[in-house]
Every structure is written in structure tokens, then in C-alpha cells.
């Protein structure tokens, strides 16, 4: 087999792998909902929705909508930090962020990041700048989520979780938090060991990331925005709990948020749908909450953030990023 044949085989394999993985995630999502529907819970869920206090639901929706420009602001910090000689204005970033969040809701999360990278590359004529800024944005957002989840596991409200699950989760999240911080702090040492190695290019990128995160105002600013973004999501969880008259305190909402979102980012279902509902239903059962109410609560969380992302669908249809001269910094 010649080189060209091998390359064609690789490309063909990649073309098959993507749809296959998406199909498997769809099967997992559908399987979870079939499991939940086995007792006809969905008919009872409709009754729960009918009695929900839509003033609280509106507050949750407002929190979800407000996240979009905040995520855009955080991402723009990285976009402009990667190439400080030129600046991208906020409005194209808001538009692209809205589009990416929409695709992330209806497809695997990586699809949203892929769309963001593609559209920003069309705007800036730089794939490197686009991909690097998206990776930084995603990495910081996930790291803050890990930290919040770790804190949540030590709140008194988390003591109602099964001890084994709580301790294992704390160990995993703690390890991730320590490894992430250590990798960032030790980047110069790691990079020096990779000089002359084929991974030296990655070392240069890592040094750039460390400089942005630790040696400029961009890192602290993006960190602050990340905590606000996740804080809004926690408030949305609390508001939805109040809308359905669930006996959950704000502290319990922090714990529930950590469980819901950490499960949602596990790449085994479409946008976390299905697996999130199963986990929340089982978790709230420990609080004595009826399964149909727990399912309605979890679905409402997904619906609220899906509704907040819907403007991104319209923007996707209307927005056409065209390369234009960027403002000098």
C-alpha cells in the first residue's frame, strides 16, 4: 500500500469515526430517556410544569441569557491577548459566541467550540489565533467549574450525598485542580525539557498560555468573569428549584449545580441530555423529592439554557463574518 492509499484510509476512518461517536451519544441520550419514561413519568412531568411559578422561571432564563455576553467578554480577552497588536471588537465575538452556544446545546459540546473556531478564523484570517483562544477559554471555564464543584463537595449540603460518591468525586476533582495548577506553574520547566523535541511547538504555545494567564491582567479578569458566569448558572438552578417549590437552599443549589454540570460535560451524551436527567432524578430521591418533580426540574434546566441559546440559531442564519481590518491596540 502506497503513502497516498494510507492517507486516504486515515481520512476515511476519520470521516466514519465522527458520525459514529455522535450516533453513540445519541443512543445514550435516547436510552436514558427511555429509562426515565418506563413508568410514564413524562405525563406527570407536564403537570409539574403547569404548576411552576413562571416568575422564578423567568429569572432563571434571564440568568442564562446574561451568560452569553459574559462568555463572549471572557473569550474576547483571550482573542486579543493572543494577538495584542490587533483588537477584535466585542460585537462579532458576541455573535459568534451565541452561535457556538447554540450548537453546543443541540450537538456534542465540541461542535460549539468547532463552530467558534471556524467563524473566528474567517473573521481574523488566523486559525492559530482562533483555535488557541477557544482552547484557553474552554480550559479556564472548565478549571473554574472544577474548583466550584470541589468547594461544593465540602459544603454541609453535600453531606446528603452517598459518602463513597462524595469522597471519590472530591479526590478526582482535587487531583484535577492540583494538576491543572501545577501544569500552569511549571510550564517554563516543562518547556525547557522539550527543547529540540518534536513537541517543542506545543511548549511554545504553553508558555504563551502561561504568560496570558499569570503575567497579564487578562488571566485575573477572565477568572473573575468565569466565576460570575457560573454564579449565574447557580442562581438559575436555585430559581428553578423555587419555581417548582423544591425544598432546596442556595447552598444545596451550589451542590446540585456542580453535579448537573460536571455530569453534562462528560462526553457520552448529546449536550448532557438524558444522563443529566437520570443523575438528578436519582440524586434528588435522597432528598425525598418525587421522581417526576426531579425530572421536571432537570428538564427545565436544560430547556432554559436551550431557550437562551436559540437567538444563536437566528444569528447563525443571518451573520456572515467577513475579514476586515482590525483596530490597532
Ranges and model annotations:
Residues 1-98, 155-265, 291-299, 303-329:
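Predominantly cytoplasmic-facing regulatory/coupling regions of multi-pass membrane proteins
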Residues 268-271, 278-302:
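Hydrophobic alpha-helical transmembrane segments in multi-pass integral membrane proteins
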Residues 69-75, 107-117, 251, 265-280:
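Transmembrane helix boundary and interhelical junction motifs in multipass membrane proteins
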Residues 80-82, 116-124, 284-286:
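Helix-loop junctions at the membrane interface of multi-pass solute transporters
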Residues 148-159, 286:
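Transmembrane alpha-helix termini and helix-breaking/packing motifs in multi-pass membrane transporters
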Residues 90-92, 112-113, 124-139, 289-300:
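Membrane-interface alpha-helices at helix entry/exit sites of multi-pass transporters
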Residues 95-104, 108, 132-144, 225, ...:
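Alpha-helical transmembrane segments of multi-pass membrane proteins
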Residues 90-122, 127, 264-270:
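Hydrophobic alpha-helical transmembrane segments of multi-pass membrane transport proteins
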Amino acid at each position: 500500500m502506497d503513502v497516498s492509499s494510507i492517507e486516504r484510509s486515515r481520512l476515511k476512518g476519520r470521516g466514519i469515526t465522527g458520525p459514529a461517536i455522535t450516533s453513540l451519544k445519541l443512543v445514550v441520550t435516547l436510552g436514558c430517556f427511555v429509562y426515565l419514561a418506563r413508568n410514564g413519568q413524562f405525563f406527570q412531568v407536564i403537570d409539574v410544569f403547569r404548576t411552576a411559578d413562571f416568575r422564578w422561571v423567568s429569572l432563571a432564563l434571564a440568568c442564562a441569557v446574561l451568560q452569553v455576553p459574559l462568555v463572549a467578554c471572557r473569550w474576547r480577552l483571550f482573542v486579543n491577548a493572543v494577538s495584542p497588536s490587533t483588537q477584535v471588537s466585542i460585537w462579532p465575538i458576541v455573535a459568534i459566541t451565541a452561535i457556538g452556544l447554540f450548537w453546543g446545546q443541540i450537538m456534542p459540546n465540541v461542535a460549539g467550540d468547532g463552530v467558534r473556531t471556524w467563524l473566528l478564523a474567517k473573521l481574523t484570517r488566523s486559525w492559530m489565533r482562533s483555535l488557541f483562544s477557544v482552547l484557553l477559554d474552554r480550559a479556564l471555564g472548565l478549571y473554574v467549574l472544577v474548583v466550584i464543584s470541589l468547594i461544593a463537595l465540602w459544603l454541609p449540603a453535600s453531606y446528603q450525598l452517598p459518602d463513597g460518591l462524595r469522597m471519590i468525586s472530591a479526590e478526582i476533582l482535587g487531583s484535577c485542580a492540583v494538576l491543572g495548577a501545577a501544569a500552569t506553574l511549571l510550564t517554563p520547566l516543562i518547556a525547557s525539557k522539550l527543547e529540540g523535541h518534536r513537541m517543542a511547538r506545543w511548549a511554545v504555545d504553553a508558555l504563551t498560555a502561561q504568560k496570558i494567564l499569570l503575567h497579564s491582567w487578562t488571566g485575573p479578569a477572565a477568572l473573575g468573569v468565569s466565576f460570575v458566569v457560573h454564579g449565574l448558572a447557580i442562581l438559575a438552578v436555585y430559581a428553578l428549584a423555587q419555581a417548582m417549590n423544591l425544598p432546596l437552599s442556595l447552598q444545596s443549589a451550589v451542590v446540585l449545580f456542580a453535579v448537573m454540570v460536571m455530569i453534562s460535560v462528560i462526553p457520552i451524551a448529546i449536550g448532557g441530555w438524558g444522563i443529566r436527567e437520570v443523575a438528578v432524578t436519582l440524586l434528588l430521591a435522597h432528598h425525598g423529592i418525587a421522581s417526576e418533580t426531579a425530572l421536571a426540574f432537570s428538564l427545565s434546566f436544560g430547556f432554559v439554557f436551550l431557550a437562551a441559546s436559540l437567538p444563536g440559531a437566528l444569528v447563525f442564519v443571518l451573520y456572515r463574518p467577513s475579514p476586515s481590518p482590525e483596530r490597532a491596540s
